[in-house]
A protein has these predicted regions:
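Short beta-strand segments
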Residues: 43-47, 82, 110-114
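A structural detector for beta-sheet-dominated domains
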Residues: 7-9, 16-20, 35-37, 50, ...
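Short, internal acidic amphipathic alpha-helical interface segments
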Residues: 58-92
Length: 138
């Protein structure tokens, strides 16, 4: 999958998905690689997720953009339960928050909790790219 990116002043997030087709019937069948830079704090990590849960996330994100209401969350079902959550307010601001972690060099656990805000106009291309990728898993 190509990179799906949101880049604004002070915030960057990138998703890349690798689906293990032979494991689609299992609850963890996809690696979601996430890169985040939020006001000069950054993380790059992988989440083990279910592609079907990711489709639900993309649908919720599309609805959030259309209605400026609700939330969209993708969360690891096991382990550190890393997550990315987007929510909207009626004025068109999209709040993004998350908790990411990774075992760094030497096995030291690294964690990043972040919050940021972007304008809704950053979402259409991001949602379009994610929806295009997810179409075969509907």
């Amino acid at each position: 999958m190509k990179e799906c990116v949101i880049k604004s002043e002070g915030f960057y997030i990138c998703f890349q998905l690798k689906v293990f087709e032979s494991d689609v019937s299992y609850s963890s069948n996809t690696i979601l690689t996430i890169s985040v830079i939020s006001d000069n704090f950054s993380a790059n990590t992988d989440m083990d997720i279910d592609i079907k849960s990711f489709v639900v996330f993309v649908d919720a994100l599309s609805s959030l953009y259309t209605t400026l209401n609700g939330t969209a969350i993708i969360q690891e079902p096991y382990g550190e339960q890393q997550y990315i959550e987007l929510s909207a307010d009626r004025s068109g601001h999209i709040n993004i928050r998350g908790k990411l972690s990774s075992n760094g060099r030497g096995g030291f656990l690294q964690k990043l909790s972040f919050e940021n805000c972007i304008d809704q106009t950053y979402l259409p291309e991001f949602i379009g790219n994610l929806s295009s990728f997810c179409s075969r898993y509907r």
